[in-house]
Design a protein with these regions (language model features):
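His/Met- and acidic-residue-enriched segments that coordinate or traffic transition-metal cofactors
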Residues: 2-11, 16-180
Length: 180
């Protein structure tokens, strides 16, 4: 049953992101030439890509090291949703001549490394706190891009991802340690 739900969630996330990409590409208007992409859009692509990579790595840790079902299920959801988001973002960034980060930031790597050494209830509490902070940061980043991004497709992508990120944040608050 859980595998069926996970597969359905992964499929839905992939279809949604692919659909958003198709809609943005079909009606998003003219793209900016890669040499004219503002620094803010470049930073968004880089930061969003790194954040997605971090969420996938953290989600995998939650699945393997989490004690509670809530943490493990949330981890599975993070892997599915953030993998799909990175695919969609890469599909938008490529034609703009922008490359996604290939790994999490140094700070994100340090957080991942600290969680690798934890297990059980301690892992769950720490992971819950990290999930809340990371999704608060992601909501701010995507809100900024949705409101002020120069590239129309990146703006659309950010706006369409915001409800999912806000849902993740709400879910993270219900995890052990997520109430901070």
């Amino acid at each position: 049953m859980k595998k069926s739900i996970l597969l359905a969630t992964c499929f839905l996330a992939a279809v949604t992101c692919t659909s958003l990409y198709a809609q943005a590409s079909a009606g998003g208007g003219p793209h900016l030439a890669s040499d004219t992409i503002p620094q803010a859009d470049r930073m968004f692509v880089s930061q969003a890509g790194a954040a997605n990579m971090a969420e996938v790595a953290l989600g995998n840790l939650a699945v393997s090291q989490g004690q509670s079902d809530a943490v493990r299920n949330f981890g599975n959801r993070m892997v599915a949703d953030h993998t799909a988001a990175n695919v969609a973002l890469n599909n938008l960034a490529g034609p703009l001549g922008l490359a996604l980060a290939q790994q999490p930031t140094l700070q994100q790597e340090q957080t991942i490394d600290s969680l690798k050494n934890m297990s059980g209830a301690s892992f769950d509490r720490h992971y819950g706190r990290v999930a809340v902070k990371d999704h608060e940061d992601a909501v701010r980043l995507f809100t900024q891009e949705a409101s002020f991004g120069a590239d129309p497709d990146l703006r659309t992508f950010a706006a369409h991802m915001l409800p999912t990120l806000k849902q993740h944040l709400s879910m993270a608050h219900s995890l052990p340690g997520g109430g901070l």
